Amino acid sequence: MSAAAGVMKPEYGPSVPRLLAPRWRAASGPAKAAATAAAVALVALLLAAGLTLENAAYSHGGNAPFSFEYRGLYRTTPDRGEYMKAVSRWPDGSLKYEFAVGPLALPRYRDEVSAELALYATGFIRSLREEYPKFSLRAEGKTKINNTLTGYEVAFFTDVEGREMYARDVLLTPPEAHPREGVLVTMLTAPGASSQVGSPLEVGETGVLLRPLKSFAFG
């Protein structure tokens, strides 16, 4: 761009920065700090909003390597023991969706893995009751995730960050004989986040959490 092109034409009047400059110079230190903080927060919000619109993928190695795709979520710091966590929040900052993956370790067993997962779920549900004071079990049982994976689900109501949530945890293992290691998939959806999700059993069956769950694969 030439120098002439960069000059504001007189008929357009002064630029916005030139109009605001006197007020900025006259503003107090705390006012400037507050304005700067607000600008930084706005930029962070816009970046987060942009990231949620992009297709993304996550993969993890180890003895039970896995991968999945997601969209409409942005990665955040996982809780202790988790491999990965991605969330979406309402404009007021409250939790809207969450998809997290952590390790699953099974003891030695002789029966089919489906039977072992059902036994494991007994203690797992007990730990959920201890973790969530407002835990209310909706259902549990075998569930088919996609064409290659079948797991065991625990669907329940609970409160997270002070608000009611629909929750669905899925215990998954690789499709092999007597696996000992797998993953725990944790999914949360706020009531009202999706018109198609009206109970914990529908979490991950439609909407934002459908993609990461249905694209989940071991190997």
Protein language model features and the residues they cover:
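Ser/Thr/Pro/Gly-rich low-complexity linker/stalk segments immediately outside membranes or between
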Residues: 24, 50-72
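Secretory pathway targeting signatures of secreted, lumenal, and periplasmic proteins
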Residues: 64-123, 157-164
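Short, well-structured beta-strand
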Residues: 145-219
